[in-house]
A protein has these predicted regions:
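Accessory cap/linker subdomain of secreted extracellular hydrolases
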Residues: 48-164
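Short glycine-enriched nucleophile-adjacent loop
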Residues: 39-51, 330
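Catalytic histidine neighborhood in serine/cysteine hydrolases
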Residues: 194-207
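Alpha/beta-hydrolase fold nucleophile elbow
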Residues: 25-37
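Short beta-strand/loop motif that positions the catalytic acidic residue
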Residues: 165, 171-173
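Glycine/threonine-rich phosphate-binding loop and adjacent beta-strand/alpha-helix elements that clamp
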Residues: 193, 215-217, 227-480
């Protein structure tokens, strides 16, 4: 018999599975769950079903808290489609046969034709082939291509699910996960929204391995407490634990974001600088100070060169620790109706070019040593904010079909862009670096950019000129 397809009965399978386990002679009636990625997402669904034998869960690297498994926000951060679902689909189904595609039911045929006509998709042969086959064996990527908006009611359903989860949970993710978004955000959103005994762990940039073996010492302490009643002290410790890059040490906190956070705006300024000093009033500056910084990005059909604006602080006089969510307020105009905004935060090391020849025989590298920390994404037409769900440090966008609005070319628009959280100490002599771009390119294998876990994004098929303003009336700034 053939499978009924994706995730048809899983909403009740969890409860039935736990019920079966409790009837076994080797079960004492106390059940826990552990797993990563999809196996983490299923733990949240099981917890919401409320079986009394489920005493605790440990979902690490779960998917988004909004939309369930493969929800819109998982694969469209800020409305920008990325290609991780292509990897999931093709690696799983590349060997399976396809038939000649037939007529799709109802509105699905219309959505398919709209996707086939999308010039942005036509730049990517691998993605376009999925459309020509009408998604056979590649349902996840096909659905992302043909349904480029969040369905109405998804957020309300998620928030109802939050209220149903009452079991203790220990969730988390790693710093690597900002590249494909869903795990990094899922852990934070569940921790923030679910009221139950809880703990949160953010680990470093090294990816968890398969089979999953990292942090099992912590998992055992967790379940010794909740399943065996052993006092391991785990619930006496601070609820938040995170790896601080730069300092390379574990830190703890009482909540997330950390209650002691000093939110600090860093303003974009002339000559590619990033400063805590706000722009001077227009009366004190000349017209030149009101002029924008500009970059023009040609599409992938013309170039693989990624254009960008780059802003850096002066070398820091002392260590600066940045921990938590980040947002960018950007005042900008474009000369087309849409673009992607891709925001990159970097730690740039000391400029060794200031050394004299006496200190070495011209051992000056071609580039400054720098380390990417995190990114943010926003498709310009998806800029509408959900004010009730937004915070200053995490803009929350609507992303529904009725909220999509093309940009008026030449109009200066205020964008609030969510940059995913990080935890890093910028050492004295280093610089905080912000880059603004609109494109990334596929440079690796398996629909990835650079390395396995950095998907690229569907970009504009038009040549777009971007103008970024940073004067007193339009104070573009990064909130750290």
């Amino acid at each position: 018999a053939k499978s009924e397809g994706h995730y048809g009965e899983e909403d009740t399978d969890h409860y039935d599975m736990i019920e079966w386990i409790t009837r076994q002679p080797w079960c004492d009636g106390n059940v826990g769950m552990v797993g990563i990625s999809g196996y983490a997402g299923e733990q949240w669904r099981a917890a919401a079903q409320g079986h009394p034998a489920l005493k605790a869960i440990f979902p690490y690297d779960a998917c988004s808290a909004y939309g369930g498994m493969f929800g819109f926000r998982d694969f469209h951060p800020g409305g920008v489609l990325h290609t991780f679902p292509y990897l999931l689909d093709v690696f799983s189904t590349v060997h399976e046969p396809r038939d000649r595609p037939g007529e799709l039911p109802g509105d699905e045929e219309k959505l398919w034709r709209e996707a086939m006509a999308n010039p942005d998709y036509k730049q990517f042969i691998n993605l376009y082939n999925i459309l020509t086959q009408k998604g056979q064996r590649t349902w996840v990527m096909y659905h992302a291509l043909t349904h480029p908006w969040e369905e109405d009611g998804v957020l309300e359903q998620a928030e109802e699910m939050f209220t149903k989860i009452r079991v203790p949970f220990y969730t988390g993710s790693g710093a690597y996960a900002y590249t494909y978004k869903l795990h990094w955000l899922g852990a934070q959103h569940y921790f923030r929204n679910v009221e139950a005994p809880k703990k949160l762990i953010f680990t470093g940039p090294a990816h968890v391995e398969r089979p999953f073996h990292q942090y099992h010492d912590e998992i055992l302490r967790w379940y010794d407490h909740w399943l065996k009643g052993v006092d391991t002290g785990i619930m006496d410790e601070p609820p938040v634990r995170y790896w601080l890059m730069g300092s390379n040490e574990w830190r703890t906190g009482e909540d997330w974001p950390l209650p002691e956070t000093e939110w600090t705006p860093f303003y974009l300024a002339d000559w590619g600088t990033l400063t805590t000093q706000p722009p001077r009033p227009a009366a004190e500056t000349g017209e030149a100070a009101r002029q924008p910084d500009v970059f023009t990005q040609m599409p992938l059909t013309r170039t693989t060169t990624v254009e960008r604006l780059r802003y850096l602080t002066e070398p820091l006089p002392h260590d600066v620790t940045v921990v938590g969510p980040i947002s960018l307020t950007l005042y900008a105009e474009i000369d087309e109706s849409d673009t992607n905004w891709i925001i990159v935060l970097k730690d740039v090391g000391p400029d060794v070019s200031v050394r004299t020849a006496r200190e070495g025989e011209r051992d000056i590298p071609a580039d400054l040593p720098e380390r990417e920390l995190t990114r943010g994404w926003l498709k310009a037409s998806y800029r509408a904010l959900d004010e009730e769900r937004s915070t200053p440090w995490e803009p929350f966008h609507k992303l529904t079909r009725d909220a999509i609005a093309p940009v008026v070319p030449g109009e200066v628009v205020e964008y609030r862009i969510h940059v995913l959280a990080t935890a890093n100490t910028f050492k004295a002599g280093h610089r905080i670096c912000l880059e603004i771009t609109s494109m990334d390119v596929p440079t690796g294998t398996g629909a990835m950019t650079g390395v396995e876990y950095i998907p690229y994004h569907v970009t504009s098929s038009q040549t777009v000129t971007h103008r970024v303003y940073h004067d007193a009336d339009r104070p573009s700034h990064l909130l750290l």
